[in-house]
Design a protein with these regions (language model features):
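Conserved catalytic network of the ASCE P-loop NTPase/AAA+ motor domain
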Residues: 19-25, 42-47, 67-71, 87, ...
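Conserved nucleotide-binding/hydrolysis micro-motifs of P-loop NTPases
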Residues: 3-5, 35-37, 56-60, 81-84, ...
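Nucleotide-state-sensitive switch-loop elements of NTP-binding domains
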Residues: 1-39, 46-53, 61
């Protein structure tokens, strides 16, 4: 789904699509973002398990932390692990995990090395995903995440409908008249906005 007009890694229709597939009984739903960076970490708010895929030579541990991926990853994957730098990338990730504030009861994201072209490590990746699901279910983290996700989805729906209502209000003779009043200094923008908002409850 295109992300045009949305400042994030996921399109606005992602939540609805996930909910639809879930209602149809899909046992697993995979969502891929448009890249890896700060705007893509919002996937953590939509997924039960977040898998962060990096390549060898991806960058030092400081950059990994700045991207926010250390905070959202449930599983790390080093793809193209047959290339030079895979061991160094794993070491950087391990060091960042060691320096994080994870306690003994927290989930420690495993680091799995894969090579997609040969399917190497894929079974290990799937085992890591299943292990996280088991942990999240037993610890109550899965229920908590889904509750947070539902609240966020409801907020997004309300915001979207309010935006649609605002677009409807900001047209017509009344809008033009208030705009003229502001330009003529007969009122201020805040008072004009309050006047327009009187109709938003309809």
């Amino acid at each position: 789904m295109a992300t045009r007009g949305h400042l994030g890694g996921l399109s606005l229709a992602t939540s609805e699509s996930i909910r639809l597939l879930d209602a149809l009984g899909s046992p697993w739903i995979l969502v891929e973002t448009v890249g890896v960076g700060q705007v893509e970490v919002e996937i953590a708010g939509k997924a039960d398990t977040t898998v962060v895929v990096v390549n060898p030579g991806w960058g030092d541990a400081v950059q990994a932390n700045k991207a926010g991926l250390m905070e959202v990853a449930d599983v790390f994957v080093i793809n193209k692990s047959d290339r030079k730098g895979a061991a160094e990338t794993q070491r950087d990730l391990e060091q960042m995990l060691d320096l994080s504030d994870l306690d003994e009861s927290s989930w420690r994201p495993p680091i799995v090395q894969t090579t997609a072209t040969t399917s190497s490590g894929i079974s290990g990746l799937w085992d890591a995903v299943l292990a996280h699901r088991e942990f999240a279910t037993a610890s109550g983290e899965l229920t908590r995440r889904r509750g947070v996700r539902l609240r966020e989805e409801l907020r997004e729906i309300v915001e979207r409908r309010l935006e649609d209502k605002a677009r409807q209000l900001c047209t017509g003779e009344r809008w033009d008249g208030l705009q003229s009043d502001v330009l003529a200094h007969r009122t201020d923008p805040w008072s004009a906005a309050d006047e327009m908002l009187k109709g938003i409850g309809g």
